[in-house]
Amino acid sequence: MDFVLTRLILLFLAATIIYSSEDESRLINDLFKSYNKVVRPVKAFKDKVVVTVGLQLIQLINVNEVNQIVTTNVRLKQQWEDVHLKWDPEDYGGIKKVRIPSSDIWRPDIVLYNNADGDFAIVQETKVLLDYTGKIIWLPPAIFKSYCEMIVTYFPFDLQNCSMKLGTWTYDGTLVVINPENDRPDLSNFMESGEWYMKDYRCWKHWVYYDCCPETPYLDITYHFLLQRLPLYFIVNVVIPCLLFSFLTGLVFYLPTDSGEKITLSVSVLLSLVVFLLVIVELIPSTSSAVPLIGKYMLFTMVFVIASIVITVIVINTHHRSPSTHIMPQWLKKIFIETIPRVMFFSTMKRPAQDQHKKKIFTEDIDISDISGKLGPTAVKYQSPILKNPDVKSAIEGAKYVAETMKSDQESTKASEEWKFVAMVLDHLLLAVFMIVCIIGTLAIFAGRLIELHMQG
């Protein structure tokens, strides 16, 4: 019994499907019996076809800053009424909607005007949804490659204003009128990008009058997208490493000159920076229209490192100076031995002796005026008989020579210590200066743009 009932139900469903298929087939044949897809679907020639256009943005595939091309995945929704494709559902088994190939009917030749790859038209031949009232809905998918003028001045904290200009290719405003479905594109199915944030998006309709036909308007719908770059990737992989290189450069001046590794460290930092720049150069837009912020910062870091090498050479040269080759001017002593240490609060550092008491070789009871042939400032009229002895005179002359030699060595050592002290003061001064310049330079390059973006919300 159940088997018989099942067979009856299946036969009934099969008959219904066959009957419905016959109704749909008959409907399609009747609709296209005398249909001409080249002619606009209007009753009179002066009538206009009103096309409603809506853009559904699915995905932002790629933003090519070098070639200034934005690749997007979209669905272009188009609605219009075809007066030749209407029917009464009662005559065709209650069928109210059918799906037919878009290539079999008239359709507006809407193209992307600012296309960047030459494929202006929509190439996907998808089906349209046809209502018994003649209303047609066509929602073809498309990959748009649109031209967008890239302003990379503030890269990687940049905003890009890109657009898609849509309009009919052959019909002017007296034949086909295009209206936007909404004042904004549809982003309900938009897949967020890992590099860009859709900050704002708008839609405008334009009436354009060309020189060839100043009385005939041509209509277009332009969708504008304000794209803000997400800079985290570039901050982590470019900005922070460059900042660390700058701080490492400053630490060169904290390394003692006697270690002999100051130049080695400076050159190592420079070579590391060059290798790093060669690796990340592909991440930066290669355009000559403007120097991006990150390019300025990389240039600043390079100059910073090279300047540290040059100054380090000067410091090392100062450290190894001697009185036989260089005599320290008094103004240099005044600045680097007296003034700067006191101003920079390292007066506790051991300074070279400024005033030393001269050692007296001879006592008041001894006069060597007879040796030099002149009376000394402390000479007395009485001379001991011992001084008349030639051996004593020779011993006194030897002692005088030794004293003068010791005095010369002490002055030479003192001068060398003064040069070393000046080099040490330079190191401490340059350490502070380089750290301050590193911080101020970084803020000067990036802070203004970051504050501007914060003010814009």
UniProtKB/Swiss-Prot annotation:
The chain crosses the membrane at residues 231-255, 263-281, 297-316, 429-447. It is a multi-pass membrane protein. The keyword Zinc does not apply. PROSITE patterns: NEUROTR_ION_CHANNEL. GO terms for molecular function: acetylcholine-gated monoatomic cation-selective channel activity; transmembrane signaling receptor activity. Residues 21-230 are extracellular. Residues 317-428 are cytoplasmic. Glycans are attached at residue 161. It catalyses: K(+)(in) = K(+)(out); Na(+)(in) = Na(+)(out). InterPro entries: Neur_chan_lig-bd, Neur_chan_lig-bd_sf, Neur_channel, Neuro-gated_channel_TM_sf, Neuro_actylchol_rec, Neurotrans-gated_channel_TM, Neurotransmitter_ion_chnl_CS, Nicotinic_acetylcholine_rcpt. Disulfide bonds join 148-162, 212-213. Oocytes. It comes from the Eukaryota. GO terms for cellular component: acetylcholine-gated channel complex; neuron projection; plasma membrane; postsynaptic membrane; synapse. It is found in: Postsynaptic cell membrane; Cell membrane. Upon acetylcholine binding, the AChR responds by an extensive change in conformation that affects all subunits and leads to opening of an ion-conducting channel across the plasma membrane. This is Acetylcholine receptor subunit alpha-1-A.
